[in-house]
């Protein structure tokens, strides 16, 4: 931290005996990650969503598109092929939409590979052009899905400065 004059991310491994430092890099701090002013009296019809849990600071300028995978519609799909097709469609949109000018919003854990009911099955290449990756945890009865908090793609998201937002 002192040498880089910034907070750092450390990655290390342990074999049970020795601890190995794998990577050390400065965390990025740009104006876009600084707290943004929040309007006090925004009409409800102008709100896309509101959060009642912790959400990171900042602003994301120049958004032109929102790709929204409806959690109810996704949850109603019964065939694995249909669920996989949703991820493939997201991948095609990722290539077509202007880089860093769109938001991806969808149910559960983005990047789910085994149980695709847990979230949209994508690879990093299917989401790498987005400005924001937003995971929606929608309660079904007593069940509240556990979100990945970007862990499937964490280092890629950090390096590309793609914002991650969990929405409960």
Question: Predicted regions span which residues?
Answer:
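Conserved divalent-metal-coordinating catalytic cores
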Residues: 1-168
């Amino acid at each position: 931290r002192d040498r880089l004059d910034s907070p750092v991310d450390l990655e290390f491994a342990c074999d049970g005996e020795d601890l190995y430092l794998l990577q050390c890099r400065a965390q990025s701090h740009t104006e876009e990650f600084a707290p943004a002013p929040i309007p006090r009296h925004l009409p409800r019809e102008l709100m896309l969503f509101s959060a009642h849990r912790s959400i990171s600071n900042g602003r994301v300028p120049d958004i032109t598109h929102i790709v929204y995978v409806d959690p109810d519609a996704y949850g109603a799909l019964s065939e694995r092929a249909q669920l996989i097709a949703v991820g493939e469609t997201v991948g095609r949109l990722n290539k077509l939409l202007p880089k860093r000018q769109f938001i991806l919003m969808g149910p559960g854990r983005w990047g789910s590979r085994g149980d695709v009911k847990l979230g949209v099955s994508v690879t990093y290449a299917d989401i790498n052009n987005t400005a924001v990756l937003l995971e929606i945890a929608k309660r079904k009865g007593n069940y509240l899905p556990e979100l990945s908090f970007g862990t499937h793609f964490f280092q890629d998201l950090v390096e590309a400065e793609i914002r991650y937002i969990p929405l409960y």
